[in-house]
Each structure stands twice: as C-alpha cells, then as structure tokens.
Amino acid sequence: MHIGRREMPRHRKARHCQRFVADSCRSTETHSQVEDRVVRALMEDDVDLWRKMKYMVISSKNNDDKTMDTMRKFCERVTMAEESVEDLYYEKKYVKRFDKDTDDYMGQVTLPSARELAAAMKVGGRIGERRRKRDERVNELERKELELCGYDLVDGQCVLTGNLTRE
C-alpha cells in the first residue's frame, strides 16, 4: 500500500506510522524479519515515513523495552545508512541524480530516495567499519607526526615532551 503526501492527511499518516511500528514489532518476529518489513515499506514509500517513524520510536514511551530496543537499534542503522550515502557518493559508488530544474549535478548531494537508502543500508555496516579504521589510521599518523616534532598527544592535547626524534 503506497501512502503519498496528498493521499492521506498528516494526522492520519502519523497514526499509520504508529500502527506500522506496532505491527512490525510482533513478538513472534525476529529482529531481521522486523528490519526486512521496514526496509520493504521504505522501498515502497517515500523517505518521510521512516523519518517520522524514527522520531516516533525515539520519543515514544508507551512501548515495552524489548520492542523499543529493537527499533532503536534499527533506527541507528538507518542513521548510519544515511551517513553512508554520503560516503558512497564520495567513493563514486553512489551516483547523484541530475537536477533538471537547476540544470546542475555538481551542487549539493541530493536527498536519497527510500530505495537508495535501503540499498545503502546493506553496505552501511561495512562503510561504518571502514570509516572507523580510516579515523584510527589518521589519528595514528597525527600522533607520529607530533612525536617527530617533540610533542605528545595526551587526552587530545599537545604536550611538549622535549624528545625530538630524528630520522
């Protein structure tokens, strides 16, 4: 069932989101089954649905802890996927759509569609891991550079050690 912007009033759409989350969190379903259903809904609907759902899940206090925990974890993955879209774009794996109105494709990265977002979720974990390793590598290089200049990095602060390392 597709729910477009003009097909359902906002207050009813919000209620639909609540029902959707409740239906998606049946105790008989596994975590991955819940995710599959949500991703399927994302691919059929526009990005608005998961944005509202994410907000509703984070702010809701009526659900039991297990359900909330499951959905929070899923929302974190969606957020990571959103960040991954940017990484994919810079790694030339995500191709930005051409904007016919402004006749421009070099400007800002366009908001990904739900389908693109769902695709990014599949690689989101790998990209998140790669980003973490890249950050660690950069931090290590910065630390070595500081050591060569006689400084040490203590709790994020540069401290002069006086030990100049010569190559």
Curated annotation (Swiss-Prot):
Protein name: Uncharacterized protein ORF2
